[in-house]
């Protein structure tokens, strides 16, 4: 009877350790994923400025230096357009 009790205690400890390791691994995975930028965001941002059709609010955010208050334009249009 004593051997069975010890065996059950050892099994419970091993299962607890396994569950703890899995939980820590999941947390590490979540932290890693939360630090990454979305692929679309990485693609649209280049050298600190937004490429064509990146979301913007002012000209200086765009590589083309031309924001139409919503998206970056491919190039700045001449005055009067």
From Swiss-Prot:
Propeptide part(s) removed at maturation, as residue ranges:
20-44
Family affiliation: Belongs to the conotoxin O2 superfamily.
Read off the lineage from the record.
Eukaryota, Metazoa, Spiralia, Lophotrochozoa, Mollusca
Output the superkingdom of the source species.
Eukaryota
Recorded domain comment = The presence of a 'disulfide through disulfide knot' structurally defines this protein as a knottin.
Which species?
Conus victoriae
Designated name of the protein? Conotoxin Vc6.13
Keyword Signal assigned to the entry: answer is yes
Annotated GO molecular function terms are: ion channel inhibitor activity; toxin activity
